[in-house]
């Protein structure tokens, strides 16, 4: 008899078929308490769990006594109670490598669109404001040869540095938990403390996961240290930034503009002051949102669950020690 797994996000037909070759697959709409209660017998028997954008906490795990592995279609896993999973010896699999290049593309797009005011001036054209040769009130700022500060030099940070260094001749500053020799050798990146990075960078790109240590890492104090001409980019996790402090910094002119792919609360409220600011480019968490990459992430998550339930945790496992 095949192991039972619960799928809480739709998959392309071929990936669903691959999953069904290995498991008895039960599809549910979400992991809400109501859904769990309505499908209590299925949850009680499930050995695997696959999906994204739902919280997996201790309360849910209590309803799943046979769960051995959960696989998320994402690189981030801040919506999982890792301690609770680990205490129950449940493997947590994720997709850390598939989306690197695509998210770096999104970051570079935010850099360019904020600096050159692409969204703002495109809307002015659509509104019929282009009635003569444009003047300084339509101008943006250069990207090439400007200093890029990267906070978080992981895979995505490296991919962004590659684009900035080779494509735009940008000097690279970075702050991370440790020195990154490859970044320094390939891109002539310079390691510095966070205060120095904030004071010297023309663009500050935040690419950090959400942890207890990074929650509200960026607040009023950090924005006050940035150049008034600086542009702030966040494509990591929204709660790493105190959004009210960011709004205040933009309103007071402490920073020039912001390009944001993530927010403290998602979806972003239609009443957010960010949406009324012409110098803010706000997009709906599209970092990895291309057809190719989302398919690749789903395929990786399927393979991860198959591997995990077969005892193979050599890669893409957040807590591999539970398999020991």
Swiss-Prot record:
**Transmembrane residue ranges:** none
Q: Which HAMAP family match?
A: 2_Hacid_dh_C_GhrB (MF_01667)
- Which gene codes for it? ghrB
Q: Name one Pfam family in it.
A: 2-Hacid_dh
Q: What class of enzyme is it?
A: oxidoreductase
Record-linked PANTHER family: 2-HYDROXYACID DEHYDROGENASE-RELATED (PTHR10996), GLYOXYLATE_HYDROXYPYRUVATE REDUCTASE B (PTHR10996:SF283)
Per the UniProt record, which EC number(s) apply here?
1.1.1.79, 1.1.1.81
Q: How does it assemble?
A: Homodimer.
Q: Which GO terms describe its molecular function?
A: glyoxylate reductase (NADPH) activity; hydroxypyruvate reductase (NADH) activity; hydroxypyruvate reductase (NADPH) activity; NAD binding
Answer whether the UniProt record assigns the keyword Acetylation to this protein: no
What's this protein's name? Glyoxylate/hydroxypyruvate reductase B
Per the entry, what this protein does is: Catalyzes the NADPH-dependent reduction of glyoxylate and hydroxypyruvate into glycolate and glycerate, respectively.
The similarity comment for this entry is: Belongs to the D-isomer specific 2-hydroxyacid dehydrogenase family. GhrB subfamily.
Q: Where is the active site?
A: 237, 266, 285 (proton donor)
| Chemical reaction(s) catalysed | glycolate + NADP(+) = glyoxylate + NADPH + H(+); (R)-glycerate + NAD(+) = 3-hydroxypyruvate + NADH + H(+); (R)-glycerate + NADP(+) = 3-hydroxypyruvate + NADPH + H(+)
Q: Which UniProt keywords apply?
A: Cytoplasm, NAD, NADP, Oxidoreductase
The protein's superkingdom reads: Bacteria
**InterPro entries, per database record:** D-isomer_2-hydroxyacid_DH, D-isomer_2_OHA_DH_cat_dom, D-isomer_DH_CS, D-isomer_DH_NAD-bd, Glyo/OHPyrv_Rdtase_B, NAD(P)-bd_dom_sf
Compartments it resides in: Cytoplasm
Instruction: Name one cellular component (GO) term.
Output: cytosol
